[in-house]
């Protein structure tokens, strides 16, 4: 994984975290960056369901890398990511969101109340509508260094 050449997601691999939307929308984007998924796919039936629904294995940009328990390594991976996807929509504020806001320069969050309450204007937002995340990825890819720095500053407030 080359620094700033990948989008990242970290979290439990369950349908309610909207992995299907993120994978499908990423596959429909024209980004040349990779999508690195740090999650528990081992012996997870949802992994096979997602593979069947999306055909993600045909997209070489999508990289399921398993789980990372070393917190220092995980922090470094977050810092190296170009952007972080957060698709959680249930359960309130998630620790992985707080960690991402504190260490990833650009965060692309599912547009739900608690994500907006936490990140405010320090993130970009997407919905589950067709084309929403893929167009947000396009906008993110076109950002200047100054724009990225502004998001980072706002996210850390």
Locations of the language-model features?
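Conserved donor-binding/catalytic core segment of Leloir-type glycosyltransferases
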Residues: 1-17, 23-30, 36
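Short donor-sugar binding/catalytic loops of nucleotide-sugar-dependent glycosyltransferases
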Residues: 10-14, 41-42, 68, 91
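Nucleotide-activated donor-binding/catalytic signature segment of Leloir-type glycosyltransferases, i.e.
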Residues: 39, 48-72
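Acidic donor-binding loop of glycosyltransferase active sites
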Residues: 76-92, 105
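Short glycine/serine-rich donor-binding loops of glycosyltransferases
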Residues: 94-97
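Short hydrophobic beta-strand element within catalytic cores of glycosyltransferases
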Residues: 102-109
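Conserved acidic donor-binding segment of nucleotide-sugar-dependent glycosyltransferases
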Residues: 123-131, 139-145
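A short, well-ordered alpha-helix in the C-terminal region of glycosyltransferases
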Residues: 146-157
């Amino acid at each position: 994984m080359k620094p700033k050449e990948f989008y990242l997601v970290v979290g439990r691999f369950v349908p309610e975290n909207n992995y299907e939307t993120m994978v499908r929308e990423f596959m429909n984007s024209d980004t040349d960056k990779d999508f690195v998924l740090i999650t528990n796919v081992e012996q997870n039936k949802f992994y096979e369901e997602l593979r069947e629904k999306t055909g993600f294995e045909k997209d070489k940009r999508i990289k399921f890398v398993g789980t990372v328990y070393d917190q220092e390594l995980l922090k470094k991976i977050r810092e190296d990511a170009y952007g972080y996807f957060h698709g959680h929509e249930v359960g309130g504020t998630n620790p992985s969101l707080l960690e991402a806001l504190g260490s990833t320069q650009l965060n692309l969050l599912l547009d739900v109340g608690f994500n907006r309450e936490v990140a405010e204007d320090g993130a970009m937002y997407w919905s589950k509508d067709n084309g929403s995340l893929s167009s947000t990825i396009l906008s993110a890819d076109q950002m200047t260094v100054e724009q990225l720095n502004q998001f980072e500053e706002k996210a850390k407030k």
